[in-house]
Swiss-Prot record:
This is Abhydrolase domain-containing protein ACTT2-2. It comes from Alternaria alternata (Alternaria rot fungus). Gene clusters encoding host-selective toxins (HSTs) are localized on conditionally dispensable chromosomes (CDCs), also called supernumerary chromosomes, where they are present in multiple copies. The CDCs are not essential for saprophytic growth but controls host-selective pathogenicity. Although conventional disruption of ACTT2 could not be accomplished due to the high number of the copies identified in the genome, the high sequence identity among these copies of ACTT2 is likely an advantage for RNA silencing, because it allows knockdown of all copies of this gene simultaneously. Disruption phenotype: Abolishes the production of ACT-toxin and impairs the formation of lesions on leaves sprayed with conidia. Does not affect growth rate of cultures, sporulation, and spore germination. Belongs to the AB hydrolase superfamily. AKT2 hydrolase family. Keywords: Hydrolase, Peroxisome, Virulence. Pathway: Mycotoxin biosynthesis.
Amino acid sequence: MQQPIVGVGHSMGGCQIATLSVTSRRIFSTMILLDPAIGPPEMGLATLGLGQLTLRRRTQWLTREDAEKALRTSFSTWDPQVLDLLIKHSIHSDKQSVEMEDGPVSLVTGRYQELVNYIKPSFIRSGKVVGQELVHQTGPVDMYHMLGLVTCSTLYLCGGESTLSTPRARELWLSRTAELSYSKDPGEMRKVDERIVPDTGHFLPMEEPKECADIIADWIDKDECMIWNCHIGKQGKIWRDLSNTNRKMNAEVWIEYLQSKL
């Protein structure tokens, strides 16, 4: 794939983007993580109670109007256009009511799809549906321990009122991300920074989409892609423009240099 490639992810998506940046090293020129679900064991999924929240969340309503009213109440802080899109795409008519003008509706994504983000569905392997110990997904904690292996500049974009990106969490993210020097090329600099969107919570991209988009665009345009175009991209072009003969000659000279150093 042609660089630069920018990774952007929110919440669990931020954790997944960060994980991809480590498992597929240098796939991203930069990444922007919006309130990512990344943290040490004491901030892991087992401590957040997300499974309980999912089980309590309503998934069916008698009419589409009832569903819309409930969603507008639950997500009243969201930008109106974003909320309209949520309502448009997140509910559908139940099979028995498709032919009716109005009738029961359900969430497009049920509880199971959300629960497996938080708790491992161990019954898939064991076949034992009940009676097993609950095991929470470890992705956010795993990624926390891999933050030092990140190989691209990173922006943490956080909600000022978020209960996930607390000052302590942000301090850990900034201090640990891309910290391991052995994974850097000589002279390589990686920028790790944060931006805070005031008066927003964990759902900051849904609450203030324009402000989030402006911050992301500014980071990409003025900072990271400019750095990539001026340095990394230029270096790659120098190599690509060489003939095969010159590439081979450079490799041989490099080998001779190593022999004098090693």
